[in-house]
Amino acid sequence: MATLRIGSRGSQLALWQANHISALLRERGHEVELEIIKTTGDKILDVALAKVGTKGMFTKEIEEALAAGKVDVAVHSLKDLPTELPQGFELAAVTKRENPRDVFLSVKYDSISGLPQGAKVGTSSLRRQAQIKAIRPDLEIFPLRGNVDTRVRKLEQGEYDAIILAFAGLNRLGKTQLVKEIISEDVMCPAAGQGALGIEIRLGDTRMREILSFLNDYDARATTTAERALLNQLGGGCQVPIGAFAEVKDGQVHLTAICARPDGSEILRESKSGADPAHLGEEVGKTLLARGATKILEDVYSQNIAAPAQP
């Protein structure tokens, strides 16, 4: 049996994810080899993600290795994967999803509402920044880059009063000690695809598609398809102020999405249900565009908006 070669970023979380998939494949009798690949996003650590604004910044180099036949499978955080894959690739599986919500971490405080006026909050996400500013315009938002350990250490050292991260990554790494609040999706709409892994292969590789098919989770595939269709309709990547949260209930997909100004002064929110996830995402996206999302996104792109300078 040929060895399956998995391509992954080298961050602690990415390696956990790749090793998790490797273990599941080994349980089914496959030999697996891990190939660590450095991406553009791993090399640029001193600039806010929104400032960089490159789609595929955490996936491009891995896809190049996949195209060249150096690896057979690419394991990604689905939220990092562009909504339209480059020519020659396909999404073989979407894994069972972790809780997709964001969380509030702090040493001293229990919630966003409990922060003192002017408190420093760390995030490099315009989506998170906008939603924080909408409920607490007095808070100061500063960029936060680096791996999970680096971000938590900066919080513990007092550089920030609080930071906002995804629950999924913290939970996978067993680092939820400073989580004070899992933020409701009504307050902090998550990123499209957050909490799920996307397993990418070369287009038409039927052997790998069959091998990986057991990893597919129906609910995760349905919800993330709706969320990513919405994001694609708006023409956004993971660095724009767009949120999407879908759930499967009674055979229907329920999708809520937001498009926001980074300063939180305007947040458009739309919810809808349907049986076809891709069509649902497109419809919600069209509604948001008709309501003014086009202007918001034009302003974001034209101003190259990013979080303030590092404190």
From Swiss-Prot:
Keywords: Porphyrin biosynthesis, Transferase
Other facts: The porphobilinogen subunits are added to the dipyrromethane group.
Modified residues (S-(dipyrrolylmethanemethyl)cysteine): C238
Family (UniProt): Belongs to the HMBS family.
Pathway participation: Porphyrin-containing compound metabolism; protoporphyrin-IX biosynthesis; coproporphyrinogen-III from 5-aminolevulinate: step 2/4
NCBIfam families listed in its UniProt record: hemC
Binding note for cofactor: Binds 1 dipyrromethane group covalently.
Role according to the record: Tetrapolymerization of the monopyrrole PBG into the hydroxymethylbilane pre-uroporphyrinogen in several discrete steps.
Protein name, UniProt field: Porphobilinogen deaminase
GO terms for cellular component: cytoplasm
GO MF term set: hydroxymethylbilane synthase activity
GO biological process entries: protoporphyrinogen IX biosynthetic process
E.C. designation(s): 2.5.1.61
Subunit structure: Monomer.
Tagged with keyword Transferase: yes
HAMAP family xrefs: Porphobil_deam
Statement: the UniProt record of this protein carries the keyword Transferase: yes
Cofactor or coenzyme needed: dipyrromethane
Reactions catalysed according to its record: 4 porphobilinogen + H2O = hydroxymethylbilane + 4 NH4(+)
CDD domains hit by this protein: PBP2_EcHMBS_like (cd13646)
